[in-house]
Amino acid sequence: MRTRAALLLALLAAGPIAACHPSASESSAVSSAPPPREAAPPVTVVGPGRDARTPEADGGPDEDASAPTSAVSLTDASAAPPPGMRLVPGGEFTMGADAGGQGDERPAHRVTLAPFWLDVTEVTHEAYAECVAARACRPPDPKILARFGGVFVSPRRPVTGISWADARAYCAFRGGRLPREAELERAVRGDDGRRFPWGNEPPTHERTVFQTSKTDEVGAHPSGRGPYGHDDLAGNVWEWMEDLYDPLAYTRPGASRGEPGTCEEILEAQRRLRAEGKQGFTGSNPIPTECERSIRAGAYNYDADGLRSTNRVHHPGSFRLLMTGVRCARSPG
């Protein structure tokens, strides 16, 4: 019987099979340039105010940007956790920041959430390969993973090179869903409003993966765990969120429930912000011209400020990036 590692390598070598949510543009090659020959990528540290987009992004749409966010169940959370998950308690917490962040992190406001289960770690190549083998997910983009000699590909490293639709399909395969922005921030901040998962102390390389050139195996930095026992909530890879990215989400009527505006409302807000010249309003990306998806949790090539619990970043859902992966959530009941 083949090991999971062997299965992973075989699947990556085989290339795309059955797409989860394909479109003509999404199934095209991401980049025609051959991968670099160096053993590891150079360290390019990114932080708020710098553009996090990279040339390895897939350019075509592969999602319905108006798709509704998943509802959070209010049922009892006292049952045993699903495998590989830990409970994030329900309740009220402070989301956002009034100072020390970007415009899209304001204002700080109270949000009430139901309890939910969240993966302890980011999804690994090993785990994602099982979904590909079941023909429920398409493989990660092979051209992305081949970059820098394939150093990002090993069974226990977080899977990357997947789009928002790929991430969503994987979580559905597991019986779960993508987390919402408010849920991820709740998992990081806990009840004490901490700046980072481990507290308010600055990041170190013992606690997390940042300011470096590649990912690490999931769970390799236990001193950086969050308040509810989750690993790598800041650093290693960005994680796709269910939500549409809304730069004015915290001023919307649904802010107390962690709900962004509709795509139409978001496009109008983006148009207004661009007209006002507020291109630096949205952290690590310029103000978009389409409805994009939120990503959270920081990445290996980001600086310390980019790992803050309130930092918000966004990309088109079709992008498949070397630094973006997934972590799944599930509502009790």
Predicted regions and their residues:
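Sec-dependent N-terminal signal peptides
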Residues: 1-26
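Short, flexible, solvent-exposed loop/turn segments with mixed acidic/basic and small polar residues
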Residues: 4-9, 102-110, 147-150
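Ser/Thr-rich, Pro/Gly/Ala-heavy low-complexity intrinsically disordered linkers and tails
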Residues: 19-78
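A short glycine-rich, aromatic-capped structural motif
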Residues: 79-144, 160-165, 187, 234-235
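Functional-site microenvironments in short loops/helix caps that host divalent-cation chemistry
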Residues: 88, 94, 98-99, 145-313, ...
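Short, structured beta-strand segments at or near domain termini in extracellular proteins/domains
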Residues: 321-333
